[in-house]
A protein has these predicted regions:
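Terminal intrinsically disordered, low-complexity extensions flanking WD-repeat/beta-propeller proteins
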Residues: 144-322
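Conserved loop/turn motif of beta-propeller repeat scaffolds
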Residues: 3, 35, 78, 121-122, ...
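Conserved strand-to-loop turn within each blade of WD40 beta-propeller repeats
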Residues: 1-3, 41-44, 83-87, 128-131, ...
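Short C-terminal beta-strands that terminate individual repeats in beta-propeller domains
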Residues: 17-21, 59-64, 101-107, 144-150, ...
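WD40-repeat beta-propellers
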Residues: 6-10, 48-51, 90-94, 134-137, ...
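Canonical WD40 repeat/beta-propeller blade segments in eukaryotic WD-repeat proteins
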Residues: 24-31, 67-74, 110-117, 154-171, ...
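WD40 beta-propeller repeat fold
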Residues: 1-56, 60-63, 207-208, 216-217, ...
Length: 322
């Protein structure tokens, strides 16, 4: 999406149906439940709708934010479009009439980078942010049900490194979420407890290199793109364990290595570090300038006092009578 192109593929048989141009660099996309539209969010804060049944038609503007959009999701019944931006806001709008805002989900303290609506529980929304939290919402009401701070799951509490959520993957069969964080690079496996309306930490998987994507397959296996290799994890006796030399893993890694020039620059592109806003401490700047003014006054007074002392020590010339 960096080259402002939207490519539409048919998977069976595999073929490219269309290549369309977006006005701005895209940040996220979602496909409607009816599979008739692609909703594309971009850096300027707009969402455009692209038809799937008419693969060559241009995009139509759906809605806009005042800030950069980072994530977009659609409710399974296609009633709502949910958008998240760099200014910590999650907006719930009507899909057919986007100017009608149903609710806001407010609570994050940094940019909102990921959104996910579990298909098994369409009334719920899970969001991830640069503040290192995963939050569970009843989005139609804009009410927060639970907040899980990922930094508390790290022994070092992430100290100077911020836990920015990069990816959020859902496993439909088990009500599990896999959360990939930017720094430190790790994957948190969370269980959705619908009755308790909570997200429960199940396991933390430490990444060997620098991971940049995560997903579940149809069999419940957890795939992690770790550096230049795909790694498969499967659950055994309640623990996620790496499965080495899996046949599918070998095939995927062969494709990655044969096309590595295409993938090589992507990990740096998808980093969340440039999304944090600069924190300008006006009080600290005021105090620094005040101290500079006081120091200048003291130096001026010292120099004036020294000049007066020199003048007082000089002998005075009296008048001489002839």
């Amino acid at each position: 999406m960096d080259n402002k192109q939207l490519l539409l593929f048919r998977t069976r048989p595999w073929e490219c149906l269309s290549v369309r141009t977006a006005l701005r660099r895209s940040t996220s996309l979602a496909i409607t439940g009816a599979e008739d539209r692609i909703l594309l969010a971009d850096k300027s804060g707009d969402v455009y709708s692209f038809s799937i049944s008419h693969p060559n038609s241009p995009g139509q503007l759906q809605l806009g934010h005042l800030s950069m959009l980072l994530a977009v999701a659609v409710s399974p019944d296609d009633r709502y479009i949910i958008t998240a931006d760099r200014d910590e806001k999650i907006r719930v709008s009507s899909l057919e009439h986007p100017y009608i805002i149903e609710a806001y989900c407010l609570g994050h303290h940094e940019f909102v980078s990921q959104l996910s609506i579990p298909p098994n529980h369409p009334q719920l929304l899970v969001s991830g942010s640069g503040d290192g939290t995963i939050r569970l919402w009843e989005y139609e009401k804009g009410s927060e049900l639970h907040c899980l701070d990922l930094s508390e799951l790290q022994p070092s509490r992430c100290e100077k490194n911020r836990c920015a959520v990069m990816r959020l993957a859902y496993c439909r069969g088990r009500d599990l979420f896999a959360v990939l964080c930017d720094s430190p690079s790790s994957v948190y496996v969370l269980e959705l407890d619908v009755e308790a309306e909570r997200l429960l930490h199940q396991q933390t998987i430490m990444v060997k290199q620098r991971a940049w994507d995560v997903t579940f397959d149809d069999c419940g296996g957890l795939w992690l793109l770790d550096g230049d290799r795909a790694v498969l994890y499967q659950q055994h006796e309640g623990r996620w364990q790496e499965i080495p030399d899996h046949p599918d893993q070998t095939k995927i890694n062969e494709v990655i290595h044969s096309n590595w020039p295409v993938f090589e620059g992507l990990p740096s592109v998808i980093s969340c570090r440039n999304l944090y806003k600069m924190n300008i401490d006006n009080m600290a700047e005021y105090r620094m300038k005040k101290e500079q003014r006081i120091d200048q006054r003291q130096k001026k007074r010292t120099s004036e006092f020294a000049a007066e002392s020199r003048d007082s020590k000089r002998p005075r010339m009296g008048a001489v009578k002839m």
